[in-house]
From Swiss-Prot:
PROSITE patterns: SM. This is Sm-like protein LSM2. Component of the heptameric LSM1-LSM7 complex that forms a seven-membered ring structure with a donut shape. The LSM subunits are arranged in the order LSM1, LSM2, LSM3, LSM6, LSM5, LSM7 and LSM4. LSM2 subunit interacts only with its two neighboring subunits, LSM1A or LSM1B and LSM3A or LSM3B. Component of the heptameric LSM2-LSM8 complex that forms a seven-membered ring structure with a donut shape. The LSM subunits are arranged in the order LSM8, LSM2, LSM3, LSM6, LSM5, LSM7 and LSM4. LSM2 subunit interacts only with its two neighboring subunits, LSM8 and LSM3A or LSM3B. SUPFAM superfamilies: Sm-like ribonucleoproteins (SSF50182). The keyword RNA-binding applies. It comes from Arabidopsis thaliana (Mouse-ear cress). Component of LSM protein complexes, which are involved in RNA processing. Component of the cytoplasmic LSM1-LSM7 complex which is involved in mRNA degradation by promoting decapping and leading to accurate 5'-3' mRNA decay. The cytoplasmic LSM1-LSM7 complex regulates developmental gene expression by the decapping of specific development-related transcripts. Component of the nuclear LSM2-LSM8 complex which is involved splicing nuclear mRNAs. GO terms for molecular function: RNA binding.
Length: 93
């Protein structure tokens, strides 16, 4: 649940989601659920030449199991807080 809580705090910020098929989509994080399914708004494809058929997509739902990486905004990451939460989760409490 660590990452679910973390991503919930990022709602409203711009993120880039890279999928396992190498498609990278940048957009505003609208919502995330416990399965780490992601809903983005105001989306745009990072490599528009490679994926021209995706140019008209403005909102999308991404299944969590197809996500390879999520790139976060630099100011959206509190590293100390994330380390503390990871330690607490690893200890089971």
């Amino acid at each position: 649940m660590l990452f679910f809580s973390y991503f919930k705090d990022l709602v409203g910020q711009e993120v880039t989601v890279e999928l396992k098929n190498d498609l990278a989509i940048r957009g505003t994080l609208h919502s995330v659920d416990q399965y780490l399914n992601i809903k983005l708004e105001n989306t745009r494809v990072v490599d528009q030449d490679k994926y021209p058929h995706m140019l008209s997509v403005r909102n999308c739902f991404i299944r969590g199991s197809v996500v390879r990486y999520v790139q976060l905004p630099k100011d959206g990451v509190d590293v100390d807080l994330l380390h503390d939460a990871a330690r607490r989760e690893a200890r089971g409490g």
